[in-house]
Amino acid sequence: MMRIALFLITNLAVMLVFGLVLSLTGIQSSSVQGLMIMAGLFGFGGAFVSLLMSKWMALRSVGGEVIEQPRNETERWLVETVRTQSQQAGIAMPQVAIYHAPDINAFATGARRDASLVAVSTGLLQNMSRDEAEAVIAHEISHIANGDMVTMTLVQGIVNTFVIFVSRLIAQVVSGFLSGNRDEGESSNGNPLVYFAVATVLELVFGILASIITMWFSRYREFHADAGSAKLVGREKMIAALQRLKTSYEPQEESSMMAFCINGKSKSFSELFMSHPPLDKRIEALRSGDYLK
């Protein structure tokens, strides 16, 4: 209920900001051109703001702590492993962080390849062998080297723009029709309450459907990150790491972080809405070498 309330409040706030921006620029939001500009600004704007704040948001969501100076042998090994692999991948040394969680997991994020972050859970450090942990770290380094965070942001921006544009275009037609504004030359949002209600419902529906696209891309990049890890540390180490993930607790990270973690949630009514492929499929892809070519 709280999430729905926050969504409605956010949606109303966005619409108010839309109106202010468009009135200041003289663009009519009821025109197709104005609606497209509005959708693009906020569709890509929100995605890129999230990207720019990704390191701060990620650390805050998991309670992660950046290693400024290694305090023990495990932290020294972790930092040196990240340093070695980042040099092999041709990227700048990422920040390294640890967060407390019982599940075996890790993630990478950051707005640029040369200003990134790699974080691992205490569950990973406690339950994986060094070879397995090396493979997981190499997987995250591969995400950074492949520029996955930026590409994911572009995909999300396109999806956001489409959802906002189509939802509000249909809402204009419906609210105008119900308000009696059927003249071809008339441009109006009709009843504001009807417009808001229809736009909100459609954004929810189209947002769920559009997530199929973003989740497909997320699964696709996981296969390539697995292959990147295999190239850095060896195929058998990566396969062993994925097999170890089968014994892990269900990931505890927030849903907003799942696409950036190596271990995604397995409980979903459909694979279409999963950010990660099933572990068995990832292992089979490595064994067949489909993404190593």
UniProtKB/Swiss-Prot annotation:
Catalytic class of the enzyme: hydrolase
EC number: 3.4.24.-
Cofactor descriptive note: Binds 1 zinc ion per subunit.
Names of the cofactor(s): Zn(2+)
Topology in membrane: Multi-pass membrane protein
Disulfide bonds, paired cysteine numbers: none
Coiled-coil features, chain-numbered ranges: none
Transmembrane annotation, as ranges: 4-24, 34-54, 158-178, 193-213
Positions contributing to Zn(2+) binding: H139, H143, E222
One GO cellular component term: plasma membrane
Claim: Ion transport is one of the keywords in the record: no
Protein name per Swiss-Prot or TrEMBL: Protease HtpX
